[in-house]
Amino acid sequence: HSNGQDVDILQHSGIYEPLAQLKQEGKIGGFGLSGKTVEGGLLALQQGDCAMVTYNLAEQAEKPVLDYAASHGKAILIKKALASGHACLTPGVDPVRASFELIFAHPGTSSAIIGTINPVHLAENVAVARAVLTSTD
């Protein structure tokens, strides 16, 4: 994960070069950055294969990174998809379903990281994700 200095990390850390070499040698399948800025996310995708971005009902500033990924065949991992457990909506609206509908509707989304320590919540989230992903409406 980046500390927020995404561009500086990508331009000065030297980490992407050995990762690119490992990919070329077939030792890894791909590489990317878990960033915090649009500029860093775009640069990560230009130089690598994927980016991990925050995208949820409350935070959508990194949407341009998803748009770029969709148009360039790059992968996106969504972090904080459920707003760190704080996704809240009006009464009667399921915040988990609404969150999944948002993130999986974007063609740039490859996967979402959904964390929980509660097995019941995990099962419920999987069921909702499955319903959203198989929905025809």
Identify the function of each model-found stretch.
Residues 1-57, 64, 74:
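Glycine/proline-rich, positively charged
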Residues 21, 42, 47, 63-137:
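Structured C-terminal cap/extension of enzyme domains
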